[in-house]
A protein has these predicted regions:
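Feature captures the catalytic cores and cofactor-binding loops of soluble hydro-lyases/lyases
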Residues: 1-146, 160-215
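Beta-strand-loop-alpha-helix segment that lines the small-molecule cofactor/substrate pocket
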Residues: 153
């Protein structure tokens, strides 16, 4: 799974016509660009900075889950900090995705768990409840159901619908193969230029075809 990036998975879903290509909002960013995330969605529906249902989901969670928190983009409170993140990491969760703000940025980034959020706010979370766990939610613009595959890296987060994982992976692998061929073509062009040999056509076939279609 790690050989396929969220970008390649998005391209795979684009070829299959999946809504938004599974791409969460561009302002949902990782706290640490060096961490790769992959796991099964455990969803949380909450609002107004209330982290009670997030606590419940963490302590009921299992290794391999990615906590997907539909926080409605709330910015007046943090939904969590490094204590909750530390508990999630200790339990073995594979990642945390929050459509809202967090705090304790440095502490969260140092944990052995990928965390994605829309920003930072020092104000403490609310504790109201009840919220909902493992229902279909919309998080950062993408519909997420329990059991969906959630993948993230420095580019952002991608969600693959549970029932379409195999076909998306196949489409993404096809895209990955194409990219390898393009990298080889680019490397070959560079070598030809450096060695003074005849330069091949570097443009992808689709570019040439579109140009010819417009002529």
């Amino acid at each position: 799974m790690k050989k396929l990036s969220p970008a390649q998975l998005c391209d795979g879903m684009a070829s299959l016509g999946i809504e938004r290509n599974g791409c969460m909002d561009a302002d949902l960013l990782p706290l640490d660009d060096g961490k790769f995330m992959v796991g099964t969605a455990c969803t949380v529906d909450t609002e107004d900075g209330d982290n009670f249902p997030i606590h419940v989901a963490i302590y009921q969670g299992k290794p391999g889950y990615v906590l997907v928190v539909a926080g409605k983009g709330y910015t007046e409170r943090a939904y969590m900090g490094d204590l909750m993140g530390g508990a999630a990491a200790a339990i073995g969760l594979s990642g945390i995705v929050i459509d809202g703000y967090v705090r304790d940025k440095v502490g969260l980034a140092a944990l052995d768990i990928p965390v994605y959020a829309k920003g930072f706010m020092q104000r403490s979370p609310a504790k109201k409840g009840p919220g909902e766990i493992n229902t279909v939610v919309t998080c950062a613009g993408v519909k997420v159901a329990p059991g969906d595959l959630v993948v993230g890296d420095y580019d952002g987060v991608t969600v693959i619908p549970r029932g379409r994982i195999e076909e998306v992976l196949a489409a993404a692998e096809k895209k990955g193969d194409y990219e390898l061929k393009r990298r080889d073509a680019i490397d070959n062009y560079r070598k030809c230029r450096e060695e003074g040999r005849e330069l091949p056509n570097l443009a992808p076939a689709w570019v040439t075809e579109m140009l010819q279609g417009k002529s």
